[in-house]
A protein has these predicted regions:
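Conserved helix-turn-beta segment of the N-terminal RecA-like "Helicase ATP-binding" lobe
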Residues: 69-90, 100
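Walker B catalytic acidic pair
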Residues: 137
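Conserved Walker A/P-loop ATP-binding site and its immediately adjacent core
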Residues: 57-75
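Conserved pre-motif I regulatory segment
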Residues: 1-36
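Conserved small/polar residues in nucleotide/adenosyl-binding loops
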Residues: 146-151
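Conserved helix/coil segment N-terminal to the catalytic DExD/H
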Residues: 91-132
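Walker A/P-loop NTP-binding motif
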Residues: 28, 44-57
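Pre-Walker A (Motif I) flank of P-loop NTPase domains
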Residues: 29-34, 56, 106-107
Length: 151
């Protein structure tokens, strides 16, 4: 399936917005991309659509439980198998979600930043077929320049 067919089938749109196509094509070509777009500009589609076209799992780092829940609900309703892992789940639910993901049942998994450093998640990530990593909120990124000497 090509970009336009995937866009129509899963998201119901006939065309992409300005800037989306360039980001999506870059992802599908295997490039690292950075999309800086205003609220409501369709950032989520820029990783959700290629996630459906890539062979492995897409991990989305998102700090907001309500956003994760809304995104997963909308994706599941559109026929995309997605899940989230955050503090709203029990340990058993997290174990099941990671087990299902390992079996290839999910294309997209939303993960709270604090879950990235748990042993259970690290074990999963080391063995999973992860094709894309996305940071959905810029404030999840921390850059350390402690190794630089500035004048």
């Amino acid at each position: 399936m090509n970009i336009n067919q995937t866009l129509k089938q899963y998201f119901g749109y006939d065309s992409l917005r300005t800037g989306q196509e360039e980001l999506i094509n870059g992802i599908l070509a295997g490039h690292d991309v950075l999309g800086i777009m205003p609220t409501g500009a369709g950032k989520s589609l820029c990783y959700q659509l290629p996630a459906l076209m890539l062979k492995g799992i897409t991990l989305v780092i998102s700090p907001l439980i309500s956003l994760m829940s809304d995104q997963v609900k909308a994706l599941n309703q559109a026929g995309v198998h997605a899940a989230y892992i955050n503090s709203s789940l029990t340990e058993n639910q997290i174990r099941m979600a990671l087990s299902y993901a390992s079996q290839g049942r999910y294309k997209i998994i939303y993960v709270a930043p604090e879950r990235l450093n748990t042993q259970r998640f690290l074990d999963f990530a080391c063995n999973a077929d992860i094709s894309m990593l996305t940071v959905d909120e810029a404030h999840c990124i921390s850059v350390s320049y402690t190794h630089l000497t500035l004048p």
